[in-house]
Structures are given as structure tokens and as C-alpha cells.
């Protein structure tokens, strides 16, 4: 759907540009005030259409980048994951704390499976990104992306787990390329496969003893059966109200 919208916007841009050029290049006598105003309106429309085409392209790029992150991290491609981050990027996953800068992000990712890179026989690790909400900011260099991960994890003949949560991520355009600026993952429910969430719930994970964070967790919360909703970066698009759990200054506080 986004690709079709992008094509239509591009077509509109071509039409508007052509009309504007015809008006500007007409060999008739000097344009009167009405024609000048019409040409000015067309020029504004071309500028607006160009901005909308760029925004739609940014949305497509961001959706792809979020999905690519998921594919890489699931298969232990730690360096590929770290390469998706900005130079001063940050990763913060549940209670592990925050790791600042691309080098520390890389260290954190390798710590997820020490001594192992790439998919492993007998190991399952998938988390799908669902319900993605993408908001490109007016500056065209910052974007907020919210999604819901559905997690499947297991070791054959050993154990299996599943879980859900939420991502509230900040993306930045660095050197003309969208990158992860702040990856913030909240896991709100974890349980083993056999018992399920009706019988058992795993407490939120804490800091790694072997890899202390650069900063304590930004948000303190308890996982299921406690009720916690990650703060929304956006207001209700119809009413304009901020959600009860949301905070309009949420991302500003994370950047400090």
C-alpha cells in the first residue's frame, strides 16, 4: 500500500512540475496577476508534493530497517545489527540497562550469545515486529517507530519460551542514511511454553553481571502479571489527547 501511495505521489509530482514548467515557459505576453498567482500556487504544490514523496520514501525505508534489524538479531548476526546503529546509538532492552555508542552496542549484541555468530542447529530465536507505527518528524532527520514483538525462543530437547512486549525506537538520518538512534525494547510478558501465561510468568531480566551497562534502565517496570504499557510517543490521532500511559516528552527524556 505504501509503495502504491509513493508511486501516485511521484506521478502527481511529475504532473505538477510539467504544468508549472508550461506556465513559466509560455511565450505569450507577460502574465497577469492571476496567472502569476496560479504559477506561485503550482510551485508551492510542487514543493509540498516533493516533501510528501520524501516522507513516504522515509516511511518505507524505516519499515524496512526495523524489519532488517529483526532478521539480523534473530540469527545472531551481531555485527550486522551493530552496523545498523548511528555512531552515538543506544540500545536498551528491558532491565539490562542502556549501552551507549555503536561500539558498546556491538559488545552488547555479541554478549547475547558469547562465542557464537550466526544461526545454530537446535536453536530457535524469532521475534516478529507487529503493529508498526511510524512517525517521521518535520525535520526529516528523526523518526519515532513503535512496534510489538512476538517472541519464540527455544533449545531443542531443553526448553522453550515465548513472550510479547513493545519497542519504542528513535531513528536518525546520519550521512543521509536512516539508522537506529535509540533502540528501546520493553518485554512485558515472558513464560515457558509448557505452562504458558496462565500458570507461570518470568520476572523481568536484570543487568548482565559480565557486562554492566553504561546507564541504569530509563524506565522501571514489572512484567506480567503486572500491567505495564510502554509509553506512547504519539497522541491519539483523532482526539489529540495523550494516552494515560504516554508522555509527550518521553523521547526528549531518553536523549538526555
Region annotations inferred by a language model:
Residues 58-74:
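Short, aromatic-enriched amphipathic alpha-helices that serve as compact interaction elements
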Residues 25-60, 175-256:
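Terminal "cap-and-tail" regions of soluble proteins that handle hydrophobic small molecules
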Residues 152-161, 190:
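Short, cysteine-centered beta-strand-loop-beta hairpins and adjacent loop/turn segments enriched
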Residues 129-134, 166-172:
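Hydrophobic/aromatic beta-strand elements that line small-molecule binding cavities or substrate pockets
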Residues 149-153, 171-173, 187:
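Beta-strand elements of well-folded, non-transmembrane domains
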Residues 11-22:
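Bacterial N-terminal signal peptides
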Residues 78-149:
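A solvent-exposed, acidic/Ser-Thr-rich amphipathic alpha-helical stretch
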Residues 2-13:
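Bacterial N-terminal signal peptides that target proteins for export
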Amino acid at each position: 500500500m505504501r509503495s502504491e501511495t509513493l508511486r501516485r505521489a511521484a506521478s502527481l509530482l511529475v504532473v505538477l512540475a510539467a504544468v508549472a514548467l508550461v506556465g513559466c515557459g509560455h511565450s505569450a505576453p507577460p502574465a497577469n496577476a492571476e496567472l502569476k498567482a496560479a504559477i506561485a500556487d503550482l510551485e508551492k504544490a510542487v514543493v509540498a508534493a516533493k516533501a510528501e514523496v520524501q516522507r513516504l520514501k522515509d516511511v518505507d525505508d524505516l519499515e524496512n530497517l526495523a524489519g532488517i534489524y529483526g532478521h539480523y538479531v534473530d540469527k545472531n548476526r551481531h555485527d550486522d545489527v551493530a552496523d545498523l546503529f548511528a555512531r552515538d546509538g543506544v540500545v536498551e532492552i528491558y532491565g539490562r540497562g542502556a549501552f551507549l555508542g555503536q561500539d558498546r552496542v556491538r559488545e552488547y549484541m555479541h554478549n547475547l550469545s558469547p562465542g557464537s555468530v550466526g544461526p545454530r542447529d537446535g536453536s530457535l530465536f524469532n521475534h516478529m515486529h507487529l503493529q508498526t507505527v511510524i512517525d517521521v518528524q518535520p525535520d526529516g532527520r528523526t523518526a519515532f517507530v513503535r512496534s510489538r514483538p512476538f517472541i519464540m525462543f527455544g533449545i531443542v530437547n531443553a526448553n522453550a519460551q515465548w513472550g510479547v512486549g513493545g519497542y519504542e525506537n528513535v531513528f536518525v538520518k546520519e550521512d543521509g542514511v536512516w539508522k537506529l538512534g535509540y533502540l528501546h525494547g520493553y518485554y512485558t510478558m515472558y513464560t515457558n511454553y509448557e505452562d504458558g501465561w496462565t500458570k507461570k510468568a518470568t520476572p523481568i531480566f536484570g543487568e548482565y553481571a559480565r557486562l554492566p551497562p553504561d546507564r541504569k534502565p530509563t524506565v522501571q517496570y514489572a512484567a506480567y502479571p503486572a500491567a505495564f504499557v510502554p509509553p506512547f510517543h504519539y497522541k491519539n490521532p483523532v482526539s489529540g489527547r495523550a494516552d494515560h500511559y504516554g508522555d509527550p516528552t518521553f523521547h526528549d527524556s531518553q536523549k538526555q
